[in-house]
Amino acid sequence: MPRVFIIGDIHGCSKTFRKLVLEKISIRKSDKIYCLGDYIDRGPDSKGVIDFIIELREKGFNIHTLRGNHEQLLLESEIDEHAKELWLKNGGDKALLSFGVSSIHDLDKKYLDFFKRTKYIIQTKHLILVHAGLNFSNADPLKDKEAILWIRNFPIDSNYLNGKLLIHGHTPKPRDFIISQPFQSPINLDGGCVFKHKEGYGSLFALNFFEKKLIEVKNID
């Protein structure tokens, strides 16, 4: 059976991400890696994160990418001035610096294509993966894209999940919270990697699904 790993919010921490994948996970061609979004912004090397994912795919590794609210803001900033202002205030300025451009309109097409191909939801036999969570008060939670990208607190509808495990990121939580979570819905994997100077935060987490084990790398960016 192939190994399955789910990785939390990276936010431009490319060195930390590379260490997690190459040294801690020791990625294999048979693995399935799911990333929960927010690859960019705030951290020092958004470009490096995306380049690494593209490189892994080109080498034949199985990397699946969800869309985070930061990728959504980047895409919306192409056409919406308010979204652009919000994105820049929330770390988009560091992303542009990393890509070596002053405007989203100057971003290389391969990066825009990467962001546009990210998925709102990934479902497997055992998992429902989203960036932020699900709004179970909606008649169809999987169609509420706003909530999928932005929701913070949400009660779980176990009947709706029907035995699947809901895993998300988006809302940074301290290490003690992340490692003490029971193996049941919802599991939050956002350890606030980019906030390494904030006590209790600053770790990038991955979940080895079938072994039910967390893997942690402290921010080295």
Predicted segments, located by residue:
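A general structural motif
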Residues: M1, R28-D31, G60-N62, K125, ...
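Conserved protein kinase catalytic core
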Residues: K15, G43-P44, L75, S137, ...
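Acidic, His/Gly-enriched loop-helix segments that form or flank divalent-metal centers
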Residues: K89-N188, G192-G202, F209-L214, N219-I220
